[in-house]
């Protein structure tokens, strides 16, 4: 996924501001509403965790709470399907 790779590259280059938040939000938008594959679910969880950390660093506690709740609500699809 190009948007996810762009966000990871921005992060690796030291970006921590609103541009990176927008890029991660773009990843969520591009994934749509599902249903999601295991890989997509993993990406969503990682993106929400990253958004949580970024919004905490940018002092936006309301958004941070939302992103943390979204990350915590996702479970791995492999954990209970046998």
Enumerate the language-model features and the residues they cover.
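Residue register within tetratricopeptide repeats
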Residues: 15-18, 62
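Flexible helix-coil transition and linker loops at the boundaries of alpha-helical arrays
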Residues: 29-41, 81
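TPR/TPR-like (Sel1-like) alpha-helical repeat modules
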Residues: 24-29, 52-77
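Structural motif corresponding to the intra-repeat A-B loop/turn of tetratricopeptide repeats
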Residues: 13-14, 58
